[in-house]
Amino acid sequence: MAVRRALIVLAHAERTSFNYAMKEAAVEALKKKGWEVVESDLYAMNFNPLISRNDITGEPKDSENFQYPVESSLAYKEGRLSPDIVAEQKKLEAADLVIFQFPLYWFGVPAILKGWFERVLVAGFAYTYATMYDKGPFQNKKTLLSITTGGSGSMYSLQGVHGDMNVILWPIQSGILRFCGFQVLEPQLVYSIGHTPPDARVQVLEGWKKRLETVWEESPLYFAPSSLFDLNFQAGFLLKKEVQEEQKKNKFGLSVGHHLGKSIPADNQIKARK
């Protein structure tokens, strides 16, 4: 059987942090099960999160009206992206599983990780309008977010002051990962880590390692398949008419983002369908 390969992308500056401990636990657990593990420790690498003309070697197609999405896509096709971007793309291409380990900052990913997404996941490499979502280039890869928060789980609940965690996760899990084709697994959520005692932290790490023993067998989260949509500009990339009619019978929407003005399916971005 072919060896599985994992890429762990860490976005935390401190080696004494719980995020670093989670990364180390993941490396240990996966290697123990025979995985090859590659890391991208973004702060340790001093990864540049800023998109710019420097991401492209050679002359741009239009230097007077430089459009990064156009120029970076062309540079990818012509092999003119900067070496640091190419190195990350090669890691991503080789990986079967990608784990993103980070603290939740302002209801999103840290800036350095956002920059990694913007610079590495260029058009042509990670997506096109013809190959996106379940038709995306990474449709045979699995991914998951491993996140720590400052607030408690109740703060991110339906009645919590921060609002539903499912809604917070949607832009990342659907708008970035699923958009590129990934099968998105249930997120690993560690709430209120700053107020978690040492013995409980050990239990969290052990539970994380236990999960990773069988992570490849996990079912992904549900996202509305592209077959439900008319995927062309003339139709506006909308749900097919017959799908819209069929969905009128259902109490719940399809997902967090495709709620259709109805109640959102419970834990759509946290738990896989049984």
Swiss-Prot record:
What's the main place this protein lives?
Answer: cytoplasm
Keywords assigned by UniProt? Answer: Acetylation, Cytoplasm, FAD, Flavoprotein, Isopeptide bond, NAD, NADP, Oxidoreductase, Phosphoprotein, Ubl conjugation
Mutating V204I: what's the consequence?
Has no effect on the catalytic efficiency toward menadione and nitrobenzene substrates
Residue location of crosslink Glycyl lysine isopeptide (Lys-Gly) (interchain with G-Cter in SUMO2): K251
Q: Which reaction does it catalyse?
A: a quinone + NADH + H(+) = a quinol + NAD(+); a quinone + NADPH + H(+) = a quinol + NADP(+); ubiquinone-10 + NADH + H(+) = ubiquinol-10 + NAD(+); menadione + NADH + H(+) = menadiol + NAD(+)
GO terms in the biological process aspect are: cell redox homeostasis; cellular response to hydrogen peroxide; cellular response to metal ion; cellular response to oxidative stress; innate immune response; negative regulation of apoptotic process; negative regulation of ferroptosis; negative regulation of protein catabolic process
The terms under GO molecular function for this entry are: identical protein binding; NAD(P)H dehydrogenase (quinone) activity; NADH:ubiquinone reductase (non-electrogenic) activity; NADPH dehydrogenase (quinone) activity; superoxide dismutase activity
EC number, UniProt record: 1.6.5.2
Q: Which positions does the record annotate as the modified residue Phosphoserine?
A: S82
Modified-residue entries (N-acetylalanine), positions: A2
Question: Which parts of the sequence bind FAD?
Answer: H12, F18, N19, Q67, L104, Y105, W106, F107, T148, T149, G150, G151, Y156, R201
**Record-listed substrate binding positions:** A126, Y127, T128
Q: What is the effect of changing S219T?
A: Has no effect on the catalytic efficiency toward menadione and nitrobenzene substrates
Q: Which GO cellular component terms, listed alphabetically, does the Swiss-Prot or TrEMBL entry include?
A: cytoplasm; cytosol; dendrite; neuronal cell body; nucleus
- Outcome following mutation: D164Q: Destroys enzyme activity
Region entry Important for apoenzyme conformational stability, spans = 225-274
Cofactor requirements of the protein = FAD
Note, other: Quinone reductase accepts electrons from both NADH and NADPH with equal efficiency. This protein is inhibited by dicoumarol.
Q: How does it assemble?
A: Homodimer. Interacts with PDLIM4 isoform 2; this interaction stabilizes PDLIM4 isoform 2 in response to oxidative stress and protects it from ubiquitin-independent degradation by the core 20S proteasome. Interacts with TP73 (via SAM domain); this interaction is NADH-dependent, stabilizes TP73 in response to oxidative stress and protects it from ubiquitin-independent degradation by the 20S proteasome. Interacts with TP53; this interaction is NADH-dependent, stabilizes TP53 in response to oxidative stress and protects it from ubiquitin-independent degradation by the 20S proteasome.
Return the similarity comment: Belongs to the NAD(P)H dehydrogenase (quinone) family.
Q: Which PANTHER family match?
A: NAD P H OXIDOREDUCTASE-RELATED (PTHR10204), NAD(P)H DEHYDROGENASE [QUINONE] 1 (PTHR10204:SF1)
Task performed by this protein? Flavin-containing quinone reductase that catalyzes two-electron reduction of quinones to hydroquinones using either NADH or NADPH as electron donors. In a ping-pong kinetic mechanism, the electrons are sequentially transferred from NAD(P)H to flavin cofactor and then from reduced flavin to the quinone, bypassing the formation of semiquinone and reactive oxygen species. Regulates cellular redox state primarily through quinone detoxification. Reduces components of plasma membrane redox system such as coenzyme Q and vitamin quinones, producing antioxidant hydroquinone forms.
Protein name (database record): NAD(P)H dehydrogenase [quinone] 1
Organism whose genome encodes this protein = Rattus norvegicus
Q: Tell me the classification of the organism that encodes this protein.
A: Eukaryota, Metazoa, Chordata, Craniata, Vertebrata
